[in-house]
Amino acid sequence: MRKLSRCEDGYVKIQGIYIYYKVCKAENEKAKLMTLHGGPGMSHDYLLSLTDLAEKGITVLFYDQFGCGRSEEPEKEKFTIDYGVEEAEAVKKNIFGDDKVFLMGSSYGGALALAYAVKYQAHLKGLIISGGLSSVPLTVKEMQRLIDELPEKYRNAIRKYGEVGDYQNPEYQEAVNYFYHQHLLRSEDWPPEVLKSLEYAEERNVYRTMNGPNEFTITGTIRDWDITDKIGIISVPTLITVGEFDEVTQNVAEVIHSKIDNSQLIVFKACSHLTMWEDRDEYNRILLQFIEKNI
């Protein structure tokens, strides 16, 4: 059992709604790290493996984005990445003031982090994109390639029931589960923090509205989102991480790496999307090394 750093949590009013946050403070703080969870529609819980960094001098901020986890939900028309960027900026100002921070985004949070950096990179010391994306269409195309590589039984079930929208069919659900254990988290026993985030995604409206029924069927409002042509202006030090078997594939990570000059790309062998759990110690070591280098 790992020791959880001293963390404080609460709510801040952001853009008219209450947003839940948790700050794990380092005793001898070297830097501040703000995290953006994925989904869209998950919660911060699955990122709590990063609390290890607080023992190494990094104060870590987590929060549940609008309509996610323990946070309130705005009107549906505000379910956009642009709204999420302004929310992130307001949370950062509320908790950390004008201090420059490192920003880490996981999965969809990586897309949000890129969009934030395009507008607010002057507020950052560095950027960390973990299994993130700059283009939803490219990501969907890559996920379809992964589906094509599944065993025939699962591939056919996804095609057959996906085409008619029968997402609750037991055969379809079995195939989704197989895909997730190959490309989302390659572990038999999933940590309770991950299960909690998935539970919130199922309960709340954001995931279905912005994303769709599952990880590889993106039919929601973000389906056409692509910021690839804008991220070239990002000049802050950028760390891009991706798992060897990541559902947001290495090809997606390579595109981001090619567009951001001051970036490095690290591929975690034998890992998939949630590398922060599959190779927790090494993942946190890499992040700490990057942060300490760019303080």
UniProtKB/Swiss-Prot annotation:
GO annotations of cellular component type: membrane
Species, as recorded: Thermoplasma volcanium (strain ATCC 51530 / DSM 4299 / JCM 9571 / NBRC 15438 / GSS1)
Active site as annotated: 107, 246, 273
Family matches, as NCBIfam families: pro_imino_pep_2, ProImpepThrmp
Presence of the UniProt keyword 4Fe-4S in the record: no
PANTHER family reported in the protein's UniProt record: AB HYDROLASE SUPERFAMILY PROTEIN YCLE, MONOACYLGLYCEROL LIPASE
Domain AB hydrolase-1: 35-279
Subunit note: Part of the tricorn proteolytic complex.
GO biological process annotation, one example: proteolysis
Record field: catalytic activity: Release of N-terminal proline from a peptide
This enzyme's EC code(s): 3.4.11.5
Gene Ontology molecular-function annotations: aminopeptidase activity
Similarity comment text for this entry: Belongs to the peptidase S33 family.
Gene3D superfamilies: alpha/beta hydrolase (3.40.50.1820)
Annotated keywords: Aminopeptidase, Hydrolase, Protease
Keyword Cell cycle part of the UniProt annotation: no
This protein's name: Proline iminopeptidase
Task performed by this protein: Cleaves H-Pro-AMC as well as a wide spectrum of amino acid substrates and several peptide substrates without a proline at the N-terminus. In conjunction with the three factors F1, F2 and F3, Tricorn degrades oligopeptides in a sequential manner, yielding free amino acids.
Name of the top EC class for this enzyme: hydrolase
